[in-house]
Amino acid sequence: MSDFMPGLLDASYYDGALVALPHSRSVPVLYYNKDRFKEAGLEEAPVTWDDLKADAKALTGNGSYGYSCPLDQWYYMSLVMNAGGTIFNETEDGIGFAGDPGTKPLYLWKEMIADGTMHVPSGQDYNSSEACRNAFAGGTAAMIQQSSAQLKGLEKTCEFEVGVGAVPQDTTLSYPAGGSNLLMFKGHSEEEEKAGWEFLKYMTNTENAVRWANGTGYLPTRQSCIDSEEYKKMVEEDPNLQIIVDQVQYSTYKTPFIPQYQEAKEIFANEIQKCI
């Protein structure tokens, strides 16, 4: 188990027991149009929220926005965490975003929208994320906040050089890991359970984890993947991959394993829309 990336393995535990293995995992990142950055005299991705606002202002004009981000729970959570909060508290029986960590991301978005520097993609959930990526590829937005799993698709679709940076921070670097894990269900025969376990081990071994990361854009889930010659060659060909892998160490918050989580996500989506 020590070979799995800690920030990803932590999300595989429930009630102190390991119940799954990391597989298709991702982190939120900032994508930016390097051509537009060069035109605006900008060299690097914004590091802080103040940098984000300043860069978005410099990049806005001629029918194009500086920044775009879906108004959904996962991207809001990434900003909450970068402001020092969490969605649920440590015991998962209360909120962890009271006060500034919960309100500052909303004020950030509201200010940028009011300034005309932030594009709000239409739709909700995956539809909104797709609209955000389309705005980026079409030149309507110079920076977008999206999943690291979208890297290969954006690099293939965009007719400009795509850059990657960490999600800008307020007080700290911290991210919610996204994606999915692999697990087995109880209630099957011993033979079926043994076969299921062999399949999980096969899907998550180093060779297949590298192959999966290369073919899908999801993160390498093992340190041995990152250390492999095949993955090093991938990074050499596309340095954006290294920037994404560097963010995994900041995936400090696991998605809560509580029955109320799906309901909470829907409440967040609705209330964020009302606030903005």
What is each model feature region?
Residues A142-S147:
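Paired acidic/hydrophobic, glycine-rich loop segments that form the ligand-binding mouth/hinge
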Residues M1-F4, G85-L106, K156-T157, Q169-Y175, ...:
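Short, solvent-exposed loop/beta-turn-alpha elements that line the ligand-binding surface or hinge
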Residues M1-V29, K38, D51-K53, L79, ...:
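Hinge/lid segment of periplasmic solute-binding proteins
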Residues N240-I276:
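C-terminal capping/gating helix-and-loop segments adjacent to ligand/active sites or protein-protein/ligand interfaces
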Residues A40, D115-M118, E155-L219, Q223, ...:
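Extracytoplasmic/periplasmic substrate-recognition and gating elements
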Residues P6-E44, C69-E92, A114, P176-F185, ...:
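Periplasmic solute-binding protein
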Residues V47-K53, S122-A137:
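Short helix-initiation/N-cap motifs at beta->coil->alpha
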Residues D55-K57, G94-Q124, V167:
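Glycine-centered hinge/linker elements that transmit conformational signals in sensory
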